[in-house]
Amino acid sequence: MTLGIPDLLVCDTKGKFHFIELKVTVGNVVKLSPNQVAWLTRHGHGSTWIMVRGREDLYLYQGKDAVELRSKGLQLKPYLQLKYPFDWEKLFDLTIN
């Protein structure tokens, strides 16, 4: 196994692969390891995502933003921010369609 590979690998109905790193935070800090940042940055041209569950909201970032997300945390503007109850269909339409 290679260090830094995201938690989820999804294959859509068209055969395209999507990688999603899952994180949980109670503050503004998003803990990404150096290996995770390197992998997400290296493959940022593809469908790579970082999904962060905060206290109340769900934040979605593109993998190519991993370096900035690690340094700025949730202060970095997300690609998508969802309020509870989460609109999972909207999230899936953006990430795997």
How should each PLM-predicted stretch be described?
Residues 1, 13, 97:
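Acidic-basic catalytic patches of nuclease active cores, encompassing PD-(D/E)XK
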Residues 4:
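Beta-rich catalytic cores
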Residues 8-10, 15-26:
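Conserved catalytic cores of phosphodiester-cleaving nucleases, focusing on short active-site segments
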Residues 25-43:
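Mg2+/Mn2+-dependent nuclease catalytic core
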Residues 33, 61-65, 84:
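Helix N-cap / beta->alpha transition motif
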Residues 43-68:
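Nucleic-acid nuclease catalytic cores
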Residues 68-75:
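Short, intrinsically disordered terminal segments enriched in charged and Pro/Gly residues
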Residues 75-97:
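Charged phosphate-binding loop/patch that engages nucleotide di/tri-phosphates or the phosphate backbone
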